Amino acid sequence: MPKREDIKRILVIGSGPITIGQAAEFDYSGTQALKALKSAGYEVIIVNSNSATIMTDPEFSDAVYIEPLTVEFLEKIIEKERPDALLPTLGGQTALNLAVELAERGILDKYGVQLIGAKLDSIKKAEDRELFKETMEKAGLEVLRSRLVNNLADALETAREFGYPVIIRPSFTLGGTGGGIAFNEEELRDIVTKGLIESPVHTVLIEESVLGWKEYELEVVRDGAGNFIVVCSIENLDPMGIHTGDSITVAPAQTLTDVEYQRMRDAAHKVIDAIGIETGGSNIQFAVDPETGRMVVIEMNPRVSRSSALASKATGYPIAKVAALLAVGFTLDEIPNYITGKTMAAFEPSIDYVVVKIPRFQLEKFPGADPRLNTQMKSVGEVMAIGRTFKEALGKALRSLELDAAPKLDLEHIREHLANPTPERISYIFAAFRNGMDVEEVHELTKIDRWFLREMKACIELEEELKLKKFDVEILKKAKQWGYSDREIAEIWGVSEKEIRKMREDNRIFPVYKMVDTCAAEFEAQTPYYYSTYNGVENEAVPSDREKIMILGSGPNRIGQGIEFDYTNVHGVWAFQEEGYETIMVNSNPETVSTDYDTSDRLYFEPLTVEDVLEIVRNEKPKGVVVAFGGQTPLKIAKYLVEERVNIIGTSFESIEIAEDREKFAKLLKQIGLKCPPFGTASSVEEALRVAENLGYPVLVRPSYVLGGRAMAIVDTPQELEMYVKEAAVVSPGYPVLIDKFLEDAIELDVDVVSDGKYVWIAGLMEQIEEAGVHSGDSACVLPPVSLSEKLVEEIEETVYKLVKALKVVGVANIQLAVKDEEIYIIEANPRASRTVPFVSKAIGIPVARIAAKIMVGRNLPELLSEYFPYPTRPGVKVDKLGESEILPTPWPKMFSVKEVVIPFHKFPGTDVLLGPEMRSTGEVMGIGEDFAEAFAKAQIAAGNPLPTTGAILATVADKDKREAVPLLAHLADMGFEIYATRGTAKALQSHGVEVKVVPKVGEGRPDVIDLLEQGKISLVVITQSSDEPALVAVSHGKEPFKVEGRRTVGYMIRTTALKRKIPYLTTVESLRAAVAAIRKMKKGSIVKVRRLTDTWKM
């Protein structure tokens, strides 16, 4: 069937901020779909609250809205843009839930908008667990015994009937949020109570347990003519009971017989028919009992998902692109296979290699959280690796994770960790085999299929052989074929990695590169991407004779290094292409736009290690390598690349080193007359205590060479300092600990700056909303700044100019400043793209990363900026021509933009929600408004923490904050809020004439503060940290990964209860001040105003 002519304009809903369970894969699938719909001749409107996405770049659609993803805002956009259709299958759970709500509230009917890609009826059948079960049973498919309940009593009754353990799955939540496994009544009470709160419809499914069964997924696509294909089978290495997002997965499935696979394929076809999926991609999960072969359908997602992104990257079949075209009426036999250019999308992909995905966790960021893996997803990112065999792919995937070696454990600890899986489980399996355990014993404890365990055990046996045959060429070859890195072999042989590399070179042991082409090399690929293998002879990655630039990606998403760096990578690729270079992308992350088959000219799906990168350089011989766009990952290996005479494009490695080394950096600042906070370094506890004594408390402590403020802290006493120094030594072994004088009550600024070596341009000057001491990645920020004087802005421009020139920046850099008593201090400089580059680009309407990339290959900055000139500048700043001064004018948009962060605290009950110098946010949203108050209010709604305009406020404020907080709370009382406060805060409020209800702290009488929160009487909590209340910190003690130190105070109990009950909370005076302004604005009139992003630039 040809495309539908009855629709012209299509609205696509994005997935919002990156959270656990919904990450960069939706930017990748959304971008792909937008390109497909535009090329088919449709007008496209995109709405997303996340500015760090390629899909919100204006070139991919006819209208971009960066607005909160709520029904109210969507209705306004629909009213304004009048789309004919809504495609909700590309924005994850968020978009599906919104589509259901828009339909049920009659909004789609009101404006004549059709749902395409998935009918309302189908979404409900797939998403509503009770309906899904009924539908499957009618289709003759087996599902697990289960019951939907909406209260605790029914849940207890059901669990008694089914027998423990039982699985609890809240309806309509993401990544298993609020769910879990209950082994007894006490656990059931706890999980069900949380699950009923998390579920938007307040129901949970109690399901019989299939712990230990094998889990499989099929990625399927179907068109309107009934054609059905399986794109890829995926096997979870981990058994049922661990969320598939936290499982190690393998494609294609390795342990299914052909008969079992056909049975599963037939069942998948029946599922699609029964649910009524007429067009698009779906993901269907099955569980198989390894003893009896009994197969049950677990669930299906009627949309593109994390697994479909993985399946697309594993096979080269662009599921999202195909699904978008199917949604507008095309059939599979009308859509070309974009990789071969010869076949059609109706051909099932065939693959002659193995793909392994491993999740990346960061539980150390959430002290107090339960590290055990269960049905609630906890990982923040993932890597994918390709090899000719499972062993090779597994080895490559493990080194892509960029993790440190696991702690050495005794057998007792190993057994415990195998039985209770944690993120380190794979290390423990290898440790078990090293300690002499056999396959059967490990299988009993882990329920992982014996085939995988035998493969892993063989690797450990090879290690023993390596120890016996030092420098044997044949055993070296075998180790390389089995996925061992030069570094691992070097460790076993007790030599340097360089020596192993030389031995390989002397014996001509090199990898060859094979192609991912969807058809096992049956047809020639037009848009090739490659993986390395030592199990092959012919090199399929034959380099062209064009001038090439290689861009190093950022590897797996993690806290501190997320989708923002992929955004800058992709913009870099496009810029180099526009300048006539062939682009080579190297990355290991399957969720991203950078690893899409048509982003760069050539894609290498490889680990970002020195060894893997050097091999690609050997094959491609690029003009140079770009390390400035991928965050800390490429910077970490830059030194070794320079040693091997690889040309680094952009800012030189010498400058990178000066910026990373505190002593060298301080010396440079002194030479050019700039200030930094006084600091010292220490290599022992004694030395640290001495340094802190000289600087005076409070001090800021951090290890060198870390990302996202890992193990950073503000310390007030010598006792706390001692505890922290021990932790820092574990995080960054062999490097000294840095100790800074902490600047209290300073304003922190974040500056994104671009330079071509002569001219310097501040692209974004952002003011942090949170107090100094909160990691800039966790603080909301505003552009343009709201509290800087004209004189101060000019001084900042001069300061940044001096520093950028001294560091010889070519391209982009990020500088963090603090202003205290009108003095400017340099906190740090990063000569690379920062996580704020996408936000700045969207706020000012100028593609910062693209301009920076072009500068790296010799373009002139004023000439590049002239395309966007005149842009809005500060009131009173008049510039007729760019380039008259070496300091180019700083953009000063008329609209205010606020970046707010999203932190996954609800995934980790038990973690304290206080903000500090260690970054914990996974994603961000952007609020745009006529003034700061409107932008801040919209950012809070977008982040899922809408501020209330009526109700009661609970206030408990530390003594140090009372002077500033009391007048702000008085404003809220004047606006009609009822104020409850603990004794000390109440006294301070009463002395200002504020009417307040005194509420006892825990232990001072009932009903107390916690009772008040549990009763649902409070709509906002204001609680600041008192100086005698230590934050909880994760401290490593060798054997056990993390233990929590610090006591659980009343403040901690209030914060965690507010989080559990989904009550908005403010933990700093600064956020209270911003909230008061936002609430006042909201009380004056609606802030549900929507504007096209491009219109906000013209104001």
From Swiss-Prot:
Residues the entry annotates as binding Mg(2+) 3: Q816, E828
Region described as Oligomerization domain: 403-541
Swiss-Prot/TrEMBL cofactor(s): Mg(2+); Mn(2+)
List of residues binding Mn(2+) 4: E828, N830
GO (cellular component) term, any one: cytoplasm
Residue ranges crossing the lipid bilayer per the database entry: none
Residue span of region Carboxyphosphate synthetic domain: 1-402
Residues that hold Mn(2+) 3 according to the record: Q816, E828
Region (Carbamoyl phosphate synthetic domain): 542-944
Pfam families linked: CPSase_L_D2, CPSase_L_D3, MGS
Residues that bind Mg(2+) 4: E828, N830
Entry-linked InterPro entries: ATP-grasp, ATP_grasp_subdomain_1, CarbamoylP_synth_lsu, CarbamoylP_synth_lsu_oligo, CarbamoylP_synth_lsu_oligo_sf, CbamoylP_synth_lsu-like_ATP-bd, CbamoylP_synth_lsu_CPSase_dom, MGS-like_dom
Enzyme class: ligase
Role of this protein: Large subunit of the glutamine-dependent carbamoyl phosphate synthetase (CPSase). CPSase catalyzes the formation of carbamoyl phosphate from the ammonia moiety of glutamine, carbonate, and phosphate donated by ATP, constituting the first step of 2 biosynthetic pathways, one leading to arginine and/or urea and the other to pyrimidine nucleotides.
Protein's name according to its UniProt entry: Carbamoyl phosphate synthase large chain
Biological source species: Thermotoga sp. (strain RQ2)
Origin organism lineage: Bacteria, Thermotogati, Thermotogota, Thermotogae, Thermotogales
